[in-house]
Amino acid sequence: MKSSSELFERRRSRNRYQIRLKSAGRLRLSVFRSNKHMYAQIIDDAEGRTLVSASTVDKELRGNLTKGGDKAAAAEVGKLLAERAKAAGYTEVVFDRGGYKYHGRVQALADAAREAGLSF
């Protein structure tokens, strides 16, 4: 029987492969979720550079949040990331859930980013 970390890695690589096939050179919004914090970044895979990032450990958000690992915090990260991306001139991205299920904090981040102006 495979461990949960092995299954997670399989899901992550399968997701990344599909994104590579379907992205057509668009930027990638990558999500990382830990038990305490939420991180998101927009990556240009052609150049291998992170263009915009936001997380619950940013100084802008740290004072406003009571917890860094709940849905409200994830929504704030999505909103901040979308604002920074729009200021830098990026609006079209491909969502990379990174092997996590599209539920809970990951979904809250994605919905907030969409509402703030990112399209994916």
Curated annotation (Swiss-Prot):
The keyword Transmembrane helix does not apply. It holds the Pfam family Ribosomal_L18p. The keyword Ribosomal protein applies. Gene3D superfamilies: 3.30.420.100. InterPro entries: Ribosomal_uL18_bac-type (IPR004389), Ribosomal_uL18_bac/euk (IPR005484). This is one of the proteins that bind and probably mediate the attachment of the 5S RNA into the large ribosomal subunit, where it forms part of the central protuberance. Part of the 50S ribosomal subunit; part of the 5S rRNA/L5/L18/L25 subcomplex. Contacts the 5S and 23S rRNAs. This is Large ribosomal subunit protein uL18. One of its GO terms (molecular function) is structural constituent of ribosome. It comes from the Bacteria. PANTHER family: 39S RIBOSOMAL PROTEIN L18, MITOCHONDRIAL, LARGE RIBOSOMAL SUBUNIT PROTEIN UL18M. Belongs to the universal ribosomal protein uL18 family. Keywords: Ribonucleoprotein, Ribosomal protein, RNA-binding, rRNA-binding. GO terms for biological process: translation. GO terms for cellular component: cytosolic large ribosomal subunit. It comes from Rhodospirillum rubrum (strain ATCC 11170 / ATH 1.1.1 / DSM 467 / LMG 4362 / NCIMB 8255 / S1).
